């Protein structure tokens, strides 16, 4: 029997979460998941990770998960701040094997962020809860095997500040592909330029689902290492066979503003959607596409 494949949006707000949660699009920082039991691949570990790990305790479709691979894009804390709230650190004897993957810079930021006295070291939290907790260093241009999935990495264009005072981060984009199944691409946080287009096209080639940094409405607004809904629309036109999700919504934008931008740039594009939290997609193998799940 073919094992179902699910893609879920758990956190789609960029940079910081909205408090109190007023948005119907996104309130939690970045977190997405790709499930094909017994393997669960997690893209970033923002505050959406708490929602994902709670679902793992309550939804039957996660019952067969034995190994979890968390793919961190970069060192900014909004992409790993959810680790301390992961349900697997607070329930005994879960039997899970969890591996945190990322660049040296990101893994070191996580280690320092959860070191004493700032918090409890993650390895200490894992004692008696997880079967195993490991870290694995990745670099741009790698290809690794995680369960049945092939993971390719690339360098993304992300930085803090502006002009000559920009501080660049070691940021990784990911392409997850399954032999005979889907290819899913995650490019966030990322500011597209003419120099990055070749990489973007290579990572999205023949794919079925693409998640992009769409922090701003327009390409002219690109700054601080972030993209736009307008650029997401460009990718959707170039990849008509893929569902393109515009995520990392800027925290200053209301739902109305985000939807207006989507209607303006997505006119005529049936394959461009907003990344909306708690929305789930299931892989339709005969059609070779993802469709919204009715769960």
Model-predicted segments: where are they?
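Binuclear metal-dependent hydrolase catalytic cores
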Residues: 1-185, 242, 255-294
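Cap/insert and terminal regions of metallo-dependent hydrolase folds
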Residues: 190-279
């Amino acid at each position: 029997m073919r094992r179902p494949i699910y893609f879920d949006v758990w956190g789609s707000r960029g940079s910081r979460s909205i408090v109190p949660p007023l948005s119907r699009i996104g309130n939690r920082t970045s977190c997405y998941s790709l499930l094909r039991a017994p393997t669960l691949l997690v893209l970033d570990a923002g505050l959406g990770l708490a929602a994902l790990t709670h679902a793992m305790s309550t939804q039957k479709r996660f019952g067969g998960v034995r190994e979890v691979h968390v793919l961190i894009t970069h060192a900014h804390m909004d992409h790993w701040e959810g680790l301390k709230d992961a349900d697997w650190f607070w329930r005994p004897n879960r039997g899970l094997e969890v591996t945190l993957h990322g660049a040296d810079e990101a893994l070191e930021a996580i280690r320092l962020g959860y070191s004493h006295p700032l918090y409890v070291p993650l390895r200490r939290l894992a004692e008696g809860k997880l079967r195993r907790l490991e870290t694995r260093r990745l670099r741009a241009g790698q290809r690794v095997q995680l369960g049945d999935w092939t993971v390719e990495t690339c360098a993304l264009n992300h930085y803090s500040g502006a002009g000559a005072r920009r501080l660049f981060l070691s940021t990784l984009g990911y392409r997850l592909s399954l032999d005979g199944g889907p290819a899913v691409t995650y490019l966030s946080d990322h500011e597209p330029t003419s120099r990055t287009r070749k990489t973007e096209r290579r990572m999205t080639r023949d794919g079925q689902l693409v998640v992009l940094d769409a922090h701003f409405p327009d390409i002219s607004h690109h700054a601080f290492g972030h993209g736009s809904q307008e650029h997401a629309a460009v990718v959707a036109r170039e990849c008509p066979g893929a569902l393109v999700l515009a995520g990392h919504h800027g925290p200053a934008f209301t739902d109305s503003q985000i939807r207006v931008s989507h209607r303006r740039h997505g006119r005529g594009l049936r394959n461009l959607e907003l990344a909306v939290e708690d929305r789930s997609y299931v892989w339709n193998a005969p059609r070779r596409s993802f469709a919204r799940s009715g769960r």
